[in-house]
Amino acid sequence: MAAMNTDAAVLAKEAANFERISGELKGVIAQVESTGSALAAQMVGQAGTAAQAALARFHEAAAKQVQELNEISANIHTSGTQYTSTDEDQAGTLASSMNI
């Protein structure tokens, strides 16, 4: 079995990238919702109903994406912490068994 090397700093950086993407997506969501709200008074009839339904579907999908990005970021943070902790624990166990 091949050894797996991890770098907690790299994992933290990648988690931050997911957080950045999530933040950018939230900004886009806000812009789309703002535009939709501004146009709501002018959207009447079937076209208005269809446009509002499309905006609702967009919001649902975008919110799901934000949730997924946040979960990925949290999982990466947790993994980095666990890898570091496990590495330190194993190093301590090895040092103890070798009386170092």
Curated annotation (Swiss-Prot):
Disulfide bonds: none annotated. Disruption phenotype: Increases efficiency of DNA conjugation when disrupted in donor strain. Loss of detectable protein for EsxA and EsxB. Residues 80-100 are annotated as: Disordered. Gene3D superfamilies: ESAT-6-like (1.10.287.1060). Pfam families: WXG100 (PF06013). GO terms for cellular component: extracellular region. Belongs to the WXG100 family. CFP-10 subfamily. An exported protein. Plays a role in DNA conjugation, in at least a donor strain. This is ESAT-6-like protein EsxB. It comes from Mycolicibacterium smegmatis (strain ATCC 700084 / mc(2)155) (Mycobacterium smegmatis).
